């Protein structure tokens, strides 16, 4: 990692550690996801890297490169200095209608571009929406670990996403249109920005996953009396929260909805956005690595050299994790089961959900 120097840790998760780093030559700050080599380099990692690399849009975090160290695979991305949209809402309680629209317009433009590129995100939520550090923050979609490409992958049928944001058809465990499920998740994000709470949680029992799922399936929500929003806004939300995805408003229809078009920034108009939709997208690529080079690096990362268990990045793991890796039996072929299926099963069983933290 001679190219970058560590600044500080900025997050962690099941994948490992996210670090803020600085390019030694250009002094540019970047975000680096550090994933331990070995079994953690799974299909989700492949999917995240390949799908993310193909996207070039101002409302999507820029993918830069992947680097292999003796102990970790490093995914280098644009750093968003403004942090998560989730934290901004937690600090403010909720947004005004105009501010919520400002961020929703950017979210829709970013997701619409993903859909144009035949990629559905499948895990849209406030924690996966970042902001840059400008006075009028630019929204940036991140984390494509659960994304799916209709070009590279089959149509999704597995349940995936954070429970509060999951569309009814996803919970049905049947084949569904990932793009329409993304529209639902965008609607949840809009609701939370306006209300400061999740639309389908039981106010008296917000951590009860089963109740949340029941309310999602029956589309049971309401706008509280203390939240004053326009009739057009309420109508848009109602058109998003439709149980039958075939009757749900589409991304194209959202972009022509009167509420969406009000005060639409010039750079988000159809004319300005057209450049990102051309086959010869003139937006410069932020990665010099070819897909073949990237996949070769990722494939190599699936092995953990025994001679390289310690070193510069060893603090991102632990001795116990290393012991686990050594004792781990060969993975069963049943790993073919989609990771998303496992995730929803766990959610149903555990009842864990980060929902109450937004309550006012």
Swiss-Prot record:
<feature type="compositionally biased region" description="Acidic residues">
    <location>
        <begin position="317"/>
        <end position="339"/>
    </location>
</feature>
<dbReference type="InterPro" id="IPR017441">
    <property type="entry name" value="Protein_kinase_ATP_BS"/>
</dbReference>
<keyword id="KW-0418">Kinase</keyword>
<dbReference type="Pfam" id="PF00069">
    <property type="entry name" value="Pkinase"/>
</dbReference>
<comment type="similarity">
    <text>Belongs to the protein kinase superfamily. Ser/Thr protein kinase family.</text>
</comment>
<protein>
    <recommendedName>
        <fullName>Serine/threonine-protein kinase SAPK4</fullName>
        <ecNumber>2.7.11.1</ecNumber>
    </recommendedName>
</protein>
<keyword id="KW-0597">Phosphoprotein</keyword>
<comment type="function">
    <text>May play a role in signal transduction of hyperosmotic response.</text>
</comment>
<feature type="active site" description="Proton acceptor">
    <location>
        <position position="123"/>
    </location>
</feature>
<feature type="binding site">
    <location>
        <begin position="10"/>
        <end position="18"/>
    </location>
    <ligand>
        <name>ATP</name>
    </ligand>
</feature>
<dbReference type="GO" id="GO:0009738">
    <property type="term" value="P:abscisic acid-activated signaling pathway"/>
</dbReference>
<feature type="region of interest" description="Disordered">
    <location>
        <begin position="303"/>
        <end position="360"/>
    </location>
</feature>
<feature type="domain" description="Protein kinase">
    <location>
        <begin position="4"/>
        <end position="260"/>
    </location>
</feature>
<keyword id="KW-0723">Serine/threonine-protein kinase</keyword>
<dbReference type="GO" id="GO:0106310">
    <property type="term" value="F:protein serine kinase activity"/>
</dbReference>
<keyword id="KW-0808">Transferase</keyword>
<dbReference type="GO" id="GO:0004674">
    <property type="term" value="F:protein serine/threonine kinase activity"/>
</dbReference>
<dbReference type="InterPro" id="IPR008271">
    <property type="entry name" value="Ser/Thr_kinase_AS"/>
</dbReference>
<keyword id="KW-0547">Nucleotide-binding</keyword>
<dbReference type="InterPro" id="IPR011009">
    <property type="entry name" value="Kinase-like_dom_sf"/>
</dbReference>
<dbReference type="InterPro" id="IPR000719">
    <property type="entry name" value="Prot_kinase_dom"/>
</dbReference>
<feature type="compositionally biased region" description="Basic and acidic residues">
    <location>
        <begin position="340"/>
        <end position="351"/>
    </location>
</feature>
<dbReference type="GO" id="GO:0005737">
    <property type="term" value="C:cytoplasm"/>
</dbReference>
<feature type="binding site">
    <location>
        <position position="33"/>
    </location>
    <ligand>
        <name>ATP</name>
    </ligand>
</feature>
<keyword id="KW-0346">Stress response</keyword>
<dbReference type="GO" id="GO:0005524">
    <property type="term" value="F:ATP binding"/>
</dbReference>
<dbReference type="GO" id="GO:0005634">
    <property type="term" value="C:nucleus"/>
</dbReference>
<keyword id="KW-0938">Abscisic acid signaling pathway</keyword>
<keyword id="KW-0067">ATP-binding</keyword>
